[in-house]
Curated annotation (Swiss-Prot):
Encoding gene per record: rutD
PANTHER family in the record: HYDROLASE, PUTATIVE (AFU_ORTHOLOGUE AFUA_2G14860)-RELATED (PTHR43798:SF33), MONOACYLGLYCEROL LIPASE (PTHR43798)
Enzyme Commission number: 3.5.1.-
Residue ranges occupied by any AB hydrolase-1 domain in the UniProt entry: 14-115
Coiled coil: none
Gene3D superfamilies assigned: alpha/beta hydrolase (3.40.50.1820)
GO biological process: nitrogen utilization; uracil catabolic process
Source lineage: Bacteria, Pseudomonadati, Pseudomonadota, Gammaproteobacteria, Enterobacterales
Alphabetically ordered keywords of this record: Hydrolase
UniProt KW Transport keyword: no
Keyword Cell inner membrane applies: no
Stated name of the protein: Putative carbamate hydrolase RutD
């Protein structure tokens, strides 16, 4: 699996791995790259079955498989220890990595994540699946911003959204791959295993997220033994895109306090 690695800013710089959500594209993290690359070696990638890692996914494709293939790719690239920043589905992959490869994962950041899918989130995906079946890729892509962004943010950026729609259609991961990745997301349940994650976790959520209620992050915080939660008042599900200044400040502070300080204590 192809990875994109930035140059380390200094010798033995900590590695931060960015994992996007259901869309699977590493470019989702573009608003974070410049600030992160000043202090960390940053890894981003298109998830298997998407973008520049095309493949046909098995019907029983799982979060555990997503974690395993990423870890194997990191080891092949010579990366043995890394922090994980995951958004939604990416946060699930991050928790799976922490469970399956605890010696490799230094810390986690969960952005609008959850322990197991909430009834409201499941309802949103049911609506989106019906759109996919009835209207195809175009209907899926055109509806997607409604679940990602605040209304006023979208209204002020109509040309940008049109360009994003065109790009998403051109690089659509395919109906079968999308549904198999979505099913993996829906099956994932960390409610009985989260207490085994012994790495520090920063939880970031947005209070106006239409897709994932903030209660999901509260449940994560209660279940994870070593976690801290930050709530952004604005930004929607893709809060790292819509309010990168606020998000980046939270992320950098979290990485500095949880990663550097914990490693210094080892």
């Amino acid at each position: 699996m192809k990875l994109s690695l930035s140059s380390p800013p200094y010798a033995d710089a900590p590695v931060v791995v960015l994992i996007s959500g259901l869309g699977g594209s590493g470019s989702y993290w573009l608003p974070q790259l410049a600030v992160l690359e000043q202090e960390y070696q940053v890894v981003c990638y298109d998830q298997r079955g998407t973008g520049n890692n095309p493949d046909t996914l098995a019907e029983d494709y799982s979060i555990a498989q997503m974690a395993a293939e990423l870890h194997q790719a990191l080891v092949a690239a010579g990366i043995e220890r890394y922090a994980v920043v995951g958004h939604a589905l990416g946060a699930l992959v991050g928790m799976q990595l922490a469970l399956d490869y605890p010696a490799s994962v230094t810390m986690l950041v969960s952005v609008n994540g959850w322990l197991r899918i909430n009834a409201h989130t499941r309802r949103c995906f049911q609506v989106r699946e019906r759109l996919l079946y009835s209207g195809g890729a175009q209907a899926w892509v055109e509806a997607q911003p409604l679940f990602l962004y605040p209304a006023d943010w979208m209204a002020a950026r109509a040309p940008r959204l049109e360009a994003e729609d065109a790009l998403a259609l051109a690089h659509f991961q395919g109906k079968n791959n999308l549904l198999r990745r979505l099913n993996a997301l829906k099956r994932a349940d960390f409610s009985h295993h989260a207490d085994r994650i012994r790495r520090p976790v920063q939880i970031i959520c947005a209070s106006d997220d239409l897709l994932v209620p903030t209660a999901c992050s509260s449940e994560l915080h209660a279940a994870l033994p070593d976690s801290q939660k930050m709530v952004m008042p604005y930004g929607g599900h893709a809060c790292n895109v819509t309010d990168p200044e606020t998000f980046n400040a939270l992320l950098l502070n979290g990485l500095a306090s949880l990663l550097h300080h914990r490693e210094a204590a080892l």
